[in-house]
Amino acid sequence: MITIWVPKRLVEIDLYNVAARSPQALADLSEQSYAQRVDYAAQKVQLSGAKIVMLTGPSASGKTTSAHCLAKALQKRGTPAQVVSLDNFFKGAEFYPRLPDGTLDYENPDTLDLPLIKQCLRELSEMGKTVLPIYDFSAEKRSAEVEPIDLQGGVCIVEGIHALRSEERRVGKECRSR
């Protein structure tokens, strides 16, 4: 498994000066830096030959946005890429564990249908295609509709807060060895 890590630098005084003089320039600089990091990640993914890339992070950290940016960067480099959200593998509200105060624990790994995740990742690795569930967030249950996905020889970017749990990593290793 390759790991792509781009460490953050300490904030320099020049950056504070840019922010004070021109907030728009700071935003532009940040966007440019982000785009360079995404392009670097796309280059690493492409060179690795990986079929499946797992992207994780805390809630609301930009996983979905980053996954779609990475897919676009790979496509610009000539590698087909599609994004799969682990959110679509939620079992449904009736299966969610509860927090001590009685509210549903949406971030508990047990909310995900792990056997179905494994099945879909294996199919993507072995055949390059699978059928994905669709989760209906307004109804808090899995939709009857499904989404077929065909990698067309490209890369699948799987994003979710539990994408790098030990079970998912084990599936990734099994898929890579085939």
PLM features per residue range, with description:
Residues R169-C175:
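Conserved small/polar residues in nucleotide/adenosyl-binding loops
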Residues Q82-V84, K91-S138:
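Conserved nucleotide-sensing/catalytic segment adjacent to the nucleotide-binding pocket
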Residues K72-Q82:
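Post-Walker A helix-loop "phosphate-sensing" segment adjacent to the P-loop in P-loop NTPases
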Residues K63:
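Conserved lysine of the Walker
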Residues M1-Y40:
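Charged, amphipathic alpha-helical linker segments immediately N-terminal to NTP-binding catalytic cores
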Residues V53-L55:
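Hydrophobic anchor at the beta1->P-loop junction of P-loop NTPases
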Residues A60:
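Walker A (P-loop) phosphate-binding loop of P-loop NTPases
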Residues S66, L70:
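Hydrophobic positions on the alpha1 helix immediately C-terminal to the Walker A/P-loop
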